[in-house]
Amino acid sequence: REKQHLYYRSGGTVKDTANFLKSQIGNYYFKTNKFQAETKVDVTNKDGSTLVSDHLDYYTSSGIADLFGPSTITNVENKIYTEKGSHNSKTNISHFIKNSIIYYSDRIVKGDSLYYNKNTDFASATGNIEIIDTVNASIIKGGYAELFKLKDSMFITDEAVAISEVVENDSIYIHGDTLLITGKLEER
């Protein structure tokens, strides 16, 4: 009681205005409004998105979850995998910094560091980026990229290269300082 520390070791559930969190092990620190969850962590947001991890620190006042170890965020539009980063369940803005991948229905985005805003469907990737476009059978690589899903466009800088399969076993490579790739005008 003096420590202002609540804990459980054999499964528990915590609910706030935005999320419903379940885990095997949990610690809540009243002074910092920090909930530390470990082992089979499952967070469901009021919009239906889920976050699954083995360890996260969740701050109830801000809605920020710091993720440690393999973690997956799934919603209707996409699925995100990371091994370290943070996700704000109130603003739907995330920043991932280790082995991070965004899986869209038509492309996969990888990078050393990923920023994602679910509200605007905007993502940026920094360092060793790779974008696999399944619709156009192409791979785009570079050092920095920004993707605007709603506008069906992206630009890539820092040793940007686009590799497109023309026919089976034959590809075309396009390289430039900056590459801008857009979908068909009538479909944007």
Residue locations for each model-derived region?
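Structural signature for solvent-exposed beta-strand/loop edge elements and short helix-capping sites
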Residues: R1-R188
